[in-house]
Amino acid sequence: MLALDALVDQDLLICPRCGSPVRREDGEWRCAGAHCVYAQDPFPVVAGVPALVDFEHSVLDADRLRAVQGASEVSRSRSAGLLRRLLHPANTTAPRNVARMLELLRTETRGRRPRVLVVGGGTVGDGLEALYADPTVDLIAFDVYASPVTQFVGDGHSVPLADASVDGVIVQAVLEHVLEPTVVASQIERVLRPGGIVYADTPFLQQVHEGAYDFTRFTDSGHRFLFRRFERIDSGSVAGAGTALRWSVDHFVRALTRSVPLGRVASLVFFWLSWTDRLLDQRHSVDAASSVFFLGRKTEEPINGSDIIDYYQGGM
Ligand SMILES: C[S@@+](CC[C@H](N)C(=O)[O-])C[C@H]1O[C@@H](n2cnc3c(N)ncnc32)[C@H](O)[C@@H]1O
Ligand SMILES: [Zn+2]
């Protein structure tokens, strides 16, 4: 991963309020714009990193963020290794698409290291281990909380990075948690250089997770249209109808018995449903997928309403 100092030295950081450069002086982070509120009041520093957030237009609250020193408001425990492997067959979609993204970027950056941004990257996403271990990629990551795998705290609704500053963007399991996905998608487009590549994967038929911080779902077509100013390289389901059904059993049992542990037990009993995803017809499965993905290249020519009707790749 790039060091925070490298982002400063390369003038990549901008004010999320007004877009002026961000300056660090005597440990304080301020906007260089003469009339900006963040020129007077510095950005908070939490867990040693700046929170480059326009708090007036964010679900984040500056005082609360300072009080918890940038810690996540949501508990981030994952089930233990063996249990996780049983319930979640390895995600092969993300590594395949990210490898393709890097291969395409490398032919274009001609020797320059590709710069890839991870939006909502507080944890290393499923199947992204190889990307994080790749010493030839300049990785930037941020999230709404401070984490050892991010360089700063930020909000995807106003990404504090300069226009056209990255070659690739990864946004995995994040767009359901933002209030305005179209705004976040247009920020992704803004920070990508012309011809830059996005990989997004997002839930479709998944129950609420992360409690109060869960807002939206996407069909495969809706997800593709969110990235309307991108040319499609590939898209489809990440986890299919079997996984969606296992989640439904879990949450049905929770609701019926008023017990989360009993829901988890039911999920374990039906673990095999997730493993059926690979056997299912892809067209029917995408209509009932647990999550969908889109890999695409930024373009000047957006698709329109009739293009998205032609795009439909389900089974009806
Ligand atoms: C389900 S987690 C996925 C995390 C990681 N991408 C992964 O796949 O392991 C959703 C993430 O979105 C982040 N998030 C929520 N709202 C956000 C926002 N407005 N801007 C950036 N990240 C956000 C959350 O903090 C959380 O880390
Ligand atoms: Zn500013």
Which residue stretches match the model-derived regions?
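Glycine/Thr-rich phosphate-binding loops of Rossmann-like dinucleotide-binding domains
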Residues: D126-G127, L179, V208
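S-adenosyl-L-methionine-dependent methyltransferase catalytic module, highlighting the catalytic core
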Residues: T182-Q187, I197-M316
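Conserved N-terminal segment of class I S-adenosyl-L-methionine
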Residues: M1-A164, G168-V171, A289-V292, T299-M316
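GHKL-family ATP-binding catalytic core of two-component histidine kinases
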Residues: P160-A162, L179, T219
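Helix-to-beta-strand junctions that scaffold the AdoMet/dcAdoMet cofactor pocket
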Residues: V178-L179, L192-P194
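A short beta-strand submotif of the Rossmann-like class I SAM-dependent methyltransferase core
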Residues: V171-V174, A200
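Ligand/cofactor pocket segment of small-molecule handling proteins
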Residues: Q172, L179, I188
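Active-site micro-motifs of SAM-dependent methyltransferase domains
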Residues: Y38, S158, E176, Q206, ...
